[in-house]
Amino acid sequence: ALCIQHSALLTGEIMTPEKLIDLAKEAMMHAYAPYSGFYVGAALLCADGTVYQGCNIENAAYGPTNCAERTAFFKAVYDGHRDFTAIAVCGGKDGVITGAFPPCGVCRQVMREFCDDDFVLYLVDKDGFETVTLKDILPHSFSPKKHMGLD
């Protein structure tokens, strides 16, 4: 169930990209997307091995819609996590993965709030996945260090 986080510390397993992707695919099936029919799932790996899943949650007014990536991050932050290693993201029409969909700009900035340039993203498509870093998708970013004049 989505309310129970997966933890490699409890099971002794190594969280591979493929396992993280499987958790993102599982999360995608919980999306609430009655308007677009576009389902997105994410699985966020914390530095301690805990994984948080998230799905997109649409709203009739569209503005309040929340992306899968932010859902996963917000759940993890609420539980006290601040160190993250990677995220797997998948999406597609009516729950069928149709291509790799990079995070939107708002999600990228949320990631930047908590993650360094080397944070890994696995962008899933129907034939596999592409590995990129946060710096790849958000160069010249506005980070907490820049905000505080430390960068």
Features from the language model and the residues they span:
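Short beta-strand scaffold segments in enzyme catalytic cores
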Residues: 37-46, 122
